[in-house]
Amino acid sequence: METLFSLPFTVLECPNVKLKKPSWLHMPSAMTVYAVVIVSYFLITGGIIYDVIVEPPSVGSMTDEHGHQRPVAFLAYRVNGQYIMEGLASSFLFTMGGLGFIILDRSNAPNIPKLNRFLLLFIGFVSVLLSFFMARVFMRMKLPGYLMG
């Protein structure tokens, strides 16, 4: 394998380039990287790529039995389609659940006082459980009759 990789370099000569890092470029802090990851996770799980390509409306409308137009936030019976508000709400729940797991992990630090540990555990569990059960409610709204035992 080594001979296979070195074969092109018997003919080609690598240039002697000396690159320096610009002085204004610094390593970002951990919280900056964390914020970028969370925001990108929020946008990707919200379906920003789908929203840009398909350009769905922010909310839909449904005609009730009296002939009145009623706004709806969920595109029912369509797994492969969504309104913008539906994607943002689901994305918020997924991000809240992920942050709940991170809060639960942070509650294991050895130097946290007992009250703060209890509060972190409580907030983490509430975030994870709330996001899980609300995602199930959203699935029930999206696909009526699904997950009905």
UniProtKB/Swiss-Prot annotation:
Residues passing through the membrane, by range: 33-53, 84-104, 118-138
Keyword annotations of the record: Membrane, Transmembrane, Transmembrane helix
GO biological process: protein glycosylation
GO cellular component annotations of the record: oligosaccharyltransferase complex
Membrane-protein topology: Multi-pass membrane protein
Record-stated family: Belongs to the OSTC family.
Record function comment: Specific component of the STT3A-containing form of the oligosaccharyl transferase (OST) complex that catalyzes the initial transfer of a defined glycan (Glc(3)Man(9)GlcNAc(2) in eukaryotes) from the lipid carrier dolichol-pyrophosphate to an asparagine residue within an Asn-X-Ser/Thr consensus motif in nascent polypeptide chains, the first step in protein N-glycosylation. N-glycosylation occurs cotranslationally and the complex associates with the Sec61 complex at the channel-forming translocon complex that mediates protein translocation across the endoplasmic reticulum (ER).
Name under which the protein is recorded: Oligosaccharyltransferase complex subunit ostc
Organism listed in the record: Danio rerio
